[in-house]
Amino acid sequence: WMETFAQRGGQLVIHGAAVGDLDYFSRTYDLVLVSAGKGELVQMFERDARRSPYSQPQRALAVSYVHGLGPRPEHPDTEGVRCNLVPGVGELFVMPCLTTSGRADILFWEGIPGGPLDVFDGVKDPAEHLSLTLGLMERYVPWEYARATKVELTDAGGTLSGRYAPTVRNPIGRLPGGGLVLGVADVVVANDPITGQGSNSASKCAAAYLASILEHGDKEFDETWMHATFDRYWDTAQHVTKWTNAMLAPPPEHILNLIGAAGQLQPVADRFAN
């Protein structure tokens, strides 16, 4: 995509960026969009407490990219994401993916902070990280561990751990020089990854912003336009945020009953999944 952008006449510059750079950009260009994960740039955008019910991380996250995972026993010929719920402990997601070394799988623990899965802080050695992951699988999801006995990391960078509070932010960043910038994707809506909606939501944010830019024509991209543009994205994103935050809380009894029924009754499973 970056190559296509450049081929079509865009100027692609790969360089570190600080708030001072954004000051310059805001004076030079009609509109500056900020896409970032965390750090100085994200701190310009204030947390929206009204839309952010959690002020602390709700899961301790640990990811391993592996080769050698066995097929799904129920559906050995098809790919799919598997979600294992361990009440009071957390969740294990198993996801197929592509990485620099080809086809791989992701073993992704989401642990309740302070619980038995919250053991990855300070673990820097990738082999130790994978060993912890597999040990927890053997204890809590032995059916998944049974097909993971021969896995190995895709590479030395195949592990990741951390945590963050799910946060919705004010979409407008105010620069020291008086300029305004508009946040994009995770800058403005950073949901927990428990629902796996980060990339989808970022794409929908880009599409909503593009539509607003094209519709605006040659008029100024002022503060009113920025708020309206974010609100257009939030019309979709709010439902993802609500669903994701609900997944972080203990499931109510009717949800457990629904999932249990879906495991026994095919018509319920079909309606639930589709």
Write out the residue ranges for each language-model feature:
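Helical element adjacent to the flavin cofactor pocket in flavoenzyme catalytic cores
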Residues: 1-14, 26-31
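Conserved SAM/SAH-binding loop
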Residues: 15-21
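Short, well-ordered coil/turn residues at beta-beta hairpins
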Residues: 16, 35-36, 48, 184
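Glycine-/small-residue-rich beta->alpha transition segments that form the dinucleotide
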Residues: 29-31, 35-40, 187
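Central beta-strand plus flanking loop segment that forms part of the substrate or channel wall
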Residues: 45-82
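Conserved FAD/dinucleotide-binding core of flavoprotein oxidoreductases
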Residues: 86-159
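FAD-binding beta-loop-beta segment adjacent to the flavin cofactor pocket
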Residues: 160-189, 193
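C-terminal helical "tail/cap" subdomain of flavin- and related membrane-associated enzymes
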Residues: 195-196, 210-274
